UniProtKB/Swiss-Prot annotation:
WD repeats lie at residues 87-128, 130-170, 174-221, 224-263, 266-326, 328-367, 372-402, 403-440. Self-associates. Interacts with nudE and dynein. It holds the Pfam family WD40. It is found in: Cytoplasm, Cytoskeleton; Cytoplasm, Cytoskeleton, Spindle pole. Keywords: Cell cycle, Cell division, Coiled coil, Cytoplasm, Cytoskeleton, Microtubule, Mitosis, Repeat, Transport, WD repeat. GO terms for molecular function: dynein complex binding. PANTHER family: WD REPEAT-CONTAINING PROTEIN POP1. This is Nuclear distribution protein nudF. The keyword Protein biosynthesis does not apply. Residues 9-41 form the LisH domain. The keyword DNA-binding does not apply. Positively regulates the activity of the minus-end directed microtubule motor protein dynein. May enhance dynein-mediated microtubule sliding by targeting dynein to the microtubule plus end. Required for nuclear migration during vegetative growth as well as development. Required for retrograde early endosome (EE) transport from the hyphal tip. Required for localization of dynein to the mitotic spindle poles. Recruits additional proteins to the dynein complex at SPBs.
Length: 441
């Protein structure tokens, strides 16, 4: 079996080929393939009907993408959404893209996680295990072994194995209150920058915890926030964490020393979301900061964004200096995502909109999707770019910036890194309207 496909994906491919051959009257070829696959594929007339158009649909989506001439570094989402994914019974709280495949995970107040095929707009499975609201999800983990992590109001973090039907392989207890945010920490290692065994969680118990996903042990607790920590983001090289919450004071943590490197003062209300700028944004943010030249791309955690219930987005440098305040949303700002191309910042809010801010034009709001959802928009994620020369499992992906530009442990940045990534022009949003929307080329 191909290492690029899970058992489920391989089975669906086989069914699609059999159904396609039958639909174009190549009955002998269809029968021969069924005979060769034997009991590994169970297919009846109803299954044939279901899968007969799937192969063509996949193929035309590939052709459509190949025909796109637009520069992906300038692509911005526009209405209408390509897909509206419905199935959750309560508000959607979080979404996350698989780093390689066309899978999207969404979490909800209904205690479930749903796995969707975002290309087809179809539900793949529902994952159950949490007993209260799922507050965040994230894909990552050791090289060659992508996992899905989830956290919940039930005080736990759970790890799920996508290659084994999303089996719950580990539960991480330890927090004393709701776990609000969870992110895999990149290793920064050459050739596999986004892989790593560490996971960070943020909680209403006012702490950040670092976990080893291979053992399930909490290896470090970061204390310093004086109220609920709602959001956390790791730097691309895994050296720093940027976190914020109800105390209104974001903190930049040095993971090696477990100490606060910088604090950021300015917000007037609870901070709902944080983001670390990719290296591709450095030239534009350096201009806004008044710097004569941008920081080297080998440096991580140079610029940051925060979104707050005070309805503003603020941009900062690593010393805690406020660069710019972005005003435009009419309600709580709930999620942020830097464009992998570096020129834009995207935001969603309880005003039901998606806003696109141009970092090259003094952070002017250049697009508003006013009908993004029918209720508060709670979450936003950008599909991580793919590294073109990744390994067989494709596990050398990045999360928002050219991975090879990150420097860790003396590894020199690759000057050709920008040519090695493929930006996926896809975002997902979730809402209190219980829907997930996919905006894509």
């Amino acid at each position: 079996m191909s290492q690029l496909l899970t058992a489920r994906q391989a089975e669906e491919l086989h069914k699609s080929i059999i159904a396609y051959l039958a639909s174009v009257n190549l009955t002998e070829s269809s029968a021969a393939l069924r005979a060769e696959l034997g009991d590994s594929v169970s297919i009846d007339d109803a299954t044939l009907k279901k899968y007969e158009g799937l192969l063509e649909k996949k193929w035309t989506s590939v052709v459509r993408l190949q025909k796109k001439n637009q520069d992906p570094t300038s692509w911005l989402p526009r209405s209408p959404a390509r897909h509206i994914l419905e199935g959750h019974r309560e508000p959607v709280t979080c979404v996350a893209f698989h780093p390689v495949f066309s899978s999207l995970a969404s979490g909800s107040d209904d205690t479930t996680i749903k796995i969707w095929d975002w290309e087809l707009g179809e539900l793949e499975r529902t994952v159950k295990g949490h007993t209260k609201a799922v507050l965040d999800v994230d894909y990552g983990g050791p090289r060659g072994g992508t996992l899905l992590a989830s956290c919940s109001s039930d005080l736990t973090i759970k790890l799920w194995d996508p290659s084994d039907n999303y089996k719950n392989i580990r539960t991480l207890p330890g927090h004393d209150h709701s776990v609000s945010s969870v992110r895999f920490i990149p290793s920064g290692a050459a050739g596999s920058p986004m892989s790593g065994n560490l996971l960070v969680s943020a909680s209403r118990d006012k702490t950040l915890r670092i976990w080893d996903v291979t053992t399930g042990y909490c290896v470090k607790t970061l204390s310093g926030h004086v109220d609920w920590v709602r959001a956390v983001a790791p730097s691309l090289d895994g050296r720093f964490l940027f976190a914020a919450g109800d105390d209104r004071i974001p903190r930049l943590w040095d993971l090696s020393s477990a100490e606060t490197k910088s604090t950021f003062l300015g917000h007037e209300h609870v901070i709902e979301c944080v983001a670390i700028a990719p290296a591709a944004s450095y030239p534009h943010l350096a201009v806004l900061s008044g710097l004569k030249k941008p920081p080297p791309v080998s440096s991580s955690a140079e610029f940051f964004a925060t979104g707050s219930r005070d309805k503003t987005i603020r941009l900062w440098d690593s010393r805690g200096n406020l660069i710019k305040t972005l005003v435009g949303h009419d309600n709580w700002v709930r999620a942020l995502a830097f464009h992998p191309g570096g020129k834009h910042l995207l935001s969603v809010a309880d005003d039901k909109t998606i806003r696109c801010w141009d970092l090259t034009q003094e952070c002017k709001c250049v697009r508003v999707i006013s009908d993004a959802h029918g209720h508060f928009v709670t979450c936003l994620r950008w599909a991580p770019p793919l590294i073109k020369d990744g390994g067989a499992n494709g596990e050398s992906e990045t999360n928002g910036a050219p991975a090879a530009t990150a420097t860790t442990n003396g590894v020199r940045p690759d000057p050709n890194a920008a040519n090695k990534i493929s930006i996926r022009c896809v975002i997902a949003t979730g809402s209190v309207d219980r829907k997930v929307r996919i905006f894509a080329t």
